[in-house]
Amino acid sequence: MAAKDKFAQRKNAGAIGGMMRTRVKERTKKMSSKTRRNYIRACNAFDVWRKGQGLSNKAVAKAPSKCVKQWQDALTEAGYSPSTIHTYIAGVCCGLGISMAGMTRAGTSADKRKSLGKSARAEKALERPENAEVVRFQRMVGGRRAALQRLKGGDLVRDESGEWCIQFLRDKGGKDQLQRIAPENLTAVQSYFKDKGPDELIFPQPIDKNLDLHGLRAEHARAEYERYAAICSTPKGRATMRAQLWRRFKNPRLGCKAWLTAKAKGDRAGMRRAERAFANEMADGQYHLQRANRATAELRGRPVSYDRLALCCVSVFALSHWRNEVTVKHYLL
């Protein structure tokens, strides 16, 4: 910690949250506004957490590194991805004026790293007999690495529309999510949960780090698009899927975060904004790729337009994303 740092010299640091935000603003003048906002958001989150833990201003000032490590452990336990934790820790370390040394990532997020694609390691990993069950399951479900590793026997459930799903607790961002199972895959998926206790891990052994799970998740997303496009090819099918999407949108635990937050605050205008945005995602018509995405699709022989409603079904029910743009760019291209 810098010797001239006023914060470090104080025995009682006062309002740590405010001081952290002030320091971030001073030290990020040459950084992008997005980085500054992320750092300030991280400081706010840390301040809320430490108050909930009963950590006083003085306790944090006396042992800032120890407190940040405790918060890092709490974020990991909550299911945040390594890259998200890294961003949070960077902001708080900046705010507290301490080094990030010793606070390295606990691994690499499968969804943030570059896909291994057709590399030799990935091909060999797919062919290994010991990986066969994970690969087969991933092609039917399309989960994230950390979520698959935590999957338990009690995580095969039905959603608000009565459809069978895999429940991923504390998935990306610490959120609980449901991903639907295609009817033709239900029996095979159920076999993984047979004779498993509610708290027994489905995959107790560490999943091979060379397995391109993101690539398999993308393969699953493309298969699900074809399935939902067939369902949405009739007026009855479109009406059914829209009704189910709205039910998920308003689910008290798994629904749209923006809408649920606005509802909790009694913000009717915010609720309407979220509803309009979601209605636009599943509007009739085609989602046409533009510029770089279109060029990439043409290069890879992929479609350059998608049915918006079917695409929204993939985003929400197969990937738990909510945004068609993310689904197309990261999974369908």
Give the location of each predicted region.
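N-terminal DNA-binding module of tyrosine recombinases/phage integrases
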Residues: 1-29
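N-terminal core-binding DNA-recognition domain of tyrosine recombinases/integrases
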Residues: 20-110
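Basic, Lys/Arg- and aromatic-enriched nucleic-acid-binding interface segment
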Residues: 117-145, 275, 298-299, 306-309
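Short, charged phosphate-coordinating catalytic segments
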Residues: 138-162, 319-330
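Short, basic/aromatic-rich helical patch in the C-terminal catalytic core of site-specific tyrosine
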Residues: 148, 216-229, 315-316
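Conserved tyrosine-mediated DNA breakage-rejoining catalytic core shared by Y-recombinases
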Residues: 151-188
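Short functional hotspots where side chains directly engage DNA or cofactors
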Residues: 164-169, 282-333
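Acidic, serine/threonine- and proline-enriched intrinsically disordered linkers and terminal tails
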Residues: 233-302
